[in-house]
């Protein structure tokens, strides 16, 4: 077993481009619920402490919102995925919805601004060009709204099934929490063709372009982000068992504690299987860990990082993050390629010096798991921001230096954590009849887009446990 792990650690099978890796793997009204103090001032010292906490959290939310303000296209409502860079992924669109909803419910923006921002973004989602005429492209230009590749050139580069699942969940949340937008969220989804992105059992398929321009399909998703994406499809009525439920896992002991990881062999698939914090944070805040086994997995991931702090006095909040320099996508892992605390790049190489105390992972664990370690996490990251631009990615473990890159994923996650802390779970398992239901309820009305009412029942065992098919060259 150790030999196999070493091969995984040093072999070339993990070598993916940053963009390919991202594609395959795939983040309360203040006055009423805890961020704005009561009128009339504090009545005793405990109220004074609470008021100070509320003011602090309000400032945190405003700082995160500054990123969105600075990076929004005024015509389409798209928000740059990285500061001052107009590339927008489908996952970024979900982050923009999350950030905007959180800002409104936390009292950071007024109703009119909220309406304008949501209307523009949903208007774009309901009319944007689609990859192969089927589904959202992996990337768009914020300024033009056109499909692009990750170098910023016009191109149809295929879709990410994981990113689409993330967007589906937030479109459903938007319609649930703000019913005036449900019709428009529904209309965006109804126009998509789901025939090749998810099968009848819930296996997710991304698409890409080979060097010669040919389109290809590949099984997409690994433990964590795959389940989060599957929940997005399930929210719209798709049978998503193969992706929403946990795949086959194996366990490794770290400090005598078990940590489960995806059993799919990265050497055979070319796709790494890191254990990361953020997918379990998002599953907790958005879904309440409602799928069997997800709460236990999250507890393992959170607890082992706290244990590292107790034993080694190393504050730890590990997750994936983005850099402006190579390797661009960093898989800062609890466990990966056979080793604990392994930091990998998109090229499969180790980047130990890029190990990070992630701002968004720290905020997420703080919101979900209050306690001494949560307080230490916040103490570590609470000043990692530019008041005019937003929150930084985090603090380097080795030196303590701030990693000053600014991204939508991190700033949206801060807002989402504050909203969760104020109001609890963000997605309710209840469906209000609307446009989507009207279009899919009639068995004689078939749009031929493989919507839930147009599908056969799942008859096979979940295919996610089988060996996935990696895209060529990955």
Question: Where do the protein language model's features map onto the residues?
Answer:
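C-terminal, flexible cofactor-proximal segment of oxidoreductases
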Residues: 1
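Bacterial N-terminal signal peptides that target proteins for export
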Residues: 4-22
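Bacterial N-terminal signal peptides
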Residues: 20-32
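Ser/Thr/Asn(+Pro)-rich, low-complexity disordered segments
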Residues: 34-474
């Amino acid at each position: 077993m150790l030999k196999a792990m070493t091969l995984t650690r040093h072999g070339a099978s993990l070598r993916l481009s940053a963009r390919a890796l991202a594609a395959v793997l795939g983040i309360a009204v203040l006055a009423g619920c805890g961020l704005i103090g009561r009128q009339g001032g504090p009545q005793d010292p405990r109220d004074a402490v609470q008021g100070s906490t509320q003011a602090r959290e309000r400032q945190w939310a405003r700082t995160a919102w500054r990123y969105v303000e600075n990076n929004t296209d005024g015509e389409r409502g798209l928000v740059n995925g990285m500061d001052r860079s107009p590339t927008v992924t489908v996952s970024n669109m979900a982050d923009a919805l999350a950030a905007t909803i959180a800002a409104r419910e936390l009292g950071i923006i007024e109703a009119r601004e909220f309406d304008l921002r949501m209307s523009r973004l949903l208007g774009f989602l309901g009319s944007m060009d689609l990859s192969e005429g089927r589904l959202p492209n992996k990337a768009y230009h914020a300024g033009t709204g056109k499909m692009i590749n990750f170098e910023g050139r016009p191109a149809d580069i295929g879709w990410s099934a994981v990113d689409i699942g993330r967007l589906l969940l937030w479109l459903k949340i938007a319609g649930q929490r703000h019913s005036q937008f449900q019709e428009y969220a529904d209309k965006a989804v109804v126009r998509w063709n789901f025939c090749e992105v998810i099968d009848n059992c819930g296996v997710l398929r991304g698409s890409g372009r080979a060097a010669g321009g040919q389109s290809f399909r590949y099984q997409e998703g690994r433990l964590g982000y795959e389940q989060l994406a599957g929940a997005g499809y399930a929210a719209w009525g798709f049978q998503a068992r193969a992706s929403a439920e946990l795949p086959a896992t194996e366990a490794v002991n770290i400090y005598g504690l078990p940590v489960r990881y995806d059993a799919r062999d990265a050497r055979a698939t070319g796709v790494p299987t890191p254990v990361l914090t953020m997918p379990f944070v998002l599953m907790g805040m958005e879904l309440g860990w409602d799928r069997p086994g997800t709460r236990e997995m999250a507890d393992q991931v959170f607890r082992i990082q706290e244990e590292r702090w107790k034993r080694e006095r190393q504050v730890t909040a590990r997750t994936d993050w983005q850099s402006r320099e190579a390797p661009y996508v960093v898989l800062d892992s609890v466990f990966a390629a056979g080793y604990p605390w392994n930091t990998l790049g998109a090229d499969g190489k180790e980047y130990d010096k890029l190990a990070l105390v992630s701002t968004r992972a720290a905020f997420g664990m703080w919101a979900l798991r209050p306690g001494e370690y949560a307080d230490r996490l916040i103490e570590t990251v609470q000043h990692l921001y530019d008041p005019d631009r937003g929150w930084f990615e985090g603090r380097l473990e080795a030196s303590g230096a701030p990693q000053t890159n600014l991204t939508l994923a991190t700033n949206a996650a801060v807002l989402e954590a504050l909203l969760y802390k104020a109001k609890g779970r963000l997605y309710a398992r209840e469906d209000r009849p609307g446009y989507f239901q009207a279009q899919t309820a009639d068995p004689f009305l078939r749009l031929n887009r493989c919507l839930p009412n147009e599908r056969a029942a799942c008859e096979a065992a979940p295919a996610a446990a089988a060996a996935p098919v990696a895209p060529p060259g990955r």
